[in-house]
Amino acid sequence: MEQKKLFLLDAYALIFRAYHAMKYSPRFTSGGMNTSAIFGFVNTLEEVLRKENPTHIAVCFDPAGKTFRHEMFADYKAGREATPEDIKVAVPYIKDIIRAYGIPVVEKEGYEADDVIGTLATMSRSRGFSTFIMSPDKDLSQLVDPSVKIYRPGYKGQPAEVRGEKEVCDVFGINRPIQVIDILALMGDKVDNIVGCPGVGEKTASKLILEFDSVENLIANTDKLKGALKTKVESNVDNILFSKKLATICTEVPIEFDEEAYSRHPVDEAAIRDIFGKLEFRSLLSRVLGDKAEAKPTPKPAPAFGELSLFGDDMTDAAAAEAEPAPTEHTCKTIIATDANIDELVDKALSQKTIGIHMVCTAPNAMDAGIAGIAVALSPDEAFYIEATEESVFDIIRILKSETVEKVGINLKFDMVVALNIAEKLAAPYYDVAIAHYLLQPEMSHSINRLAEIYLKKILPDYQLPATAKANKFNPALSLEIEDIAKVACARAAACLELKPVFDKKLEEEKMAHLLHDIELPLVEVLADMEHTGVRIDTDALAAYSKALTQRLADIERTCIDLAGIQFNVGSPAQVGEVLFDRLKIDEKAKKTKTGQYSTTEEVLEKLSGKHPIVGKILEFRKIKKLLSTYVNALPELINPHTGKIHTTYNQTVTATGRLSSTNPNLQNIPIRNDDGREIRKAFIPDDGHSFFSADYSQIELRIVANISKDEALVEAFLAGEDIHRATAAKIFHERTEDVTDDQRRKAKTANFGMIYGISAFGLSERLQIPRSEAKQLIEGYFKTFPGVRRFMDQSIEMAKEKGFVTTLFGRRRMLPDITSRNAVVRGYAERNAINAPIQGTAADIIKIAMNRIYRRFDREGIRSKMLLQVHDELNFDVVPGEEDSVSRIVKEEMEAAFSGTVPLVADCGLGANWLEAH
């Protein structure tokens, strides 16, 4: 007899996991609806159905409203962030999909999904089931027994994990899974607002339960504890016992175990086709229905905010109703180059006007990678693959270096860096389909598989590594046979070639082709050169600074303990809250709930900084600790052992505004406004004997506001060369410029920059620490003084509502589908973006133009100095001796010439022995 296998899915845990897994490459319908959560959940469901083949299955949801735990504790889950609007929209679709699969949706008013799962799992034992609870949440581990296991779905390439009794006990360091409740009772759960025993983490909790078996036994034997731990437990007995009640999953929910309903049923093909059609899940439709998915009309896509098409056009009913074929498997004639045919193939490629390319590399990090091979598409239907050998690499280089053949690919910056590793280059002309798509849909995924599916209606083959294969640790794909590698690489090269005319047409229609050809594509080469050049770090200086900061941390901790008059862990938010509000009574309004802990976020502490000297010390402690972990101790770990430099990666297709971002390290977040942060910049140094040069745009965003708004008073102040913040203060406060006080200038400066981000009276009052009425008057005075700025803000919001996007001065678009959201918070965020995106996006365009101009001029004039870093509105260079004057002149000229408006740009420059001195 077949073993009955029951899968119980924790719906919301899987939905949130799917949503956040695709946070940086979300999926959207052509109507602008974010389908990431739905797509991820359905993929997970499909995977478990196919791989595990359960005989019975149910999906459990949390019901709307409160549960019995809220009756026990009113603030249960009070700290949870609001559910994202995209998930709220997704849930009804997910429930419809589950039902279309013939799977029951189970929820019970007054109980959480965990309780429903616990009850069904308990009932399944007596019915002979082998039960698997599918969830990433640790709480459910308390239910594990010989017939119930936890099934943790795979994540980020990792396989699914099944945890039985032994595995749960090993993970938590306990003897029995039921003791997970005791672990949670001690360590608490911030997400659910279960405080536990403040100051006791998971490791300590595990040790205590391993020794005492339960929290009840621990409480009865606190005389065996010592020091601070003894004090913590004894002073939190009620909290611990109450937390255990909250953490215990109820296994007696009043529901029936409907074995027939939970058994597998056929998929409702019509319903699946209808729902997947609306969501534009074409590849999923093919996977679920197979051949039955073919030759059916695609339903009208699901509506979303603004009813925008994939490219932002108004979507007509006729266009929406037009039948679209489901994606089919990509087919491409694939030839593998041999000694006999390689010359003919390469010559044929070099005779083309345009080819598609896809480079296969030996490592995921460009600076460590070599060329393993290259696929070249002669047409969308024919491609060849050259495996890199000592002889064939020269043929590959011939293709890359061609200045007559346009090379169309994806993520070409990576390929350029790899080519530079062998002192070669991928020469212009080239075309990157990810960048082209980024201009059209900046917040969508730009992966080649996704682009091919959406625009070509093709499913590209992917690398399938057999479970028994021994993977290449640098690039698992290289463990495959050359035929398999060639098939995937050639399909990608062919898809790139086929995508180019699709994107070119749309870019021309949307009048954005110039952004691609004049700004973004030329920048690829600039960024590749910067990444490959890298920057030196003074490790000795950082080591000394680390030692000094560590000593300061110890000194601050001692000072805090002295000020508190009690021993406590300054790094523990829970203990800090107890000291500030229970012992020192700094804020009488900071009421402590029955089992909650005080909020000691930076925002909270900043408001209290004037009430007691310990608050400032705690803030200082946290800033130093973050500085140490994020930069001082982390930067040396990022040094490439072969070059001795840090090679940051610039991301050209990530931010919605058009700004560049960087990773490993994130240069954009290096602090500069305090002495501690500036010491980090001091550690960035030029090559031996060279100088460090820095150039920074002066108040570029305010200058852009003046140019966009054409506000007469703002333009006049800039053209007069006045201190813009002092001039603003003089106008707002009706003072002569020379009579403006420092405090008035400070307020005007905050208002100037706050307006760019659509700051409210509440926000301004918080930032300036002034009454809201005064902040309101300040804002009213600002807009009375600068009516053109108010007009620009209103017009930007109206444009967003009308078109679904706003544009920079250069025509770059920021899509704003939430501008008509019914949720006031979500809509307000979109309105602030409507104001800020044209400003920030224009600044991004300008710095990119400047980088291109400087790079080309350096090349024309034979300048050997190198551009190293781009951070916000600042460029940094390694300057060869004797080129100081030339670099200073060229950089300043080209940065200021990058944009011509009524209010000119100004670049401030500096030279020094390191980044700090230069800046």
Show where each model-derived region lies.
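C-terminal or mid-to-C-terminal helical accessory/interaction module adjacent to the motor/catalytic core
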Residues: N175-E202, V237, E256, E260-H265, ...
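Conserved catalytic core of nucleic-acid polymerases
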Residues: N475-L478, H532, N640-T643, H647-T648, ...
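C-terminal polymerase-core module
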Residues: Q551, D555-R558, D562-G616, K784-N836, ...
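Short alpha-helix plus adjacent loop in nuclease-associated cores
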Residues: D75-V89, D145-I174, K230-K232, F384-Y385, ...
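Extended two-metal-dependent nuclease catalytic cores across DNA- and RNA-processing enzymes
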Residues: E2-K4, Y24-F28, A78-I255, E453
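Extended, highly charged clamp/arch subdomains and adjacent linkers
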Residues: M1-F61, G65-K77, V89-D96, V237, ...
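Conserved RNase H-like, two-metal-ion catalytic cores of nucleic-acid enzymes
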Residues: L6-F7, R17-H56, A74-D75, G79-D86, ...
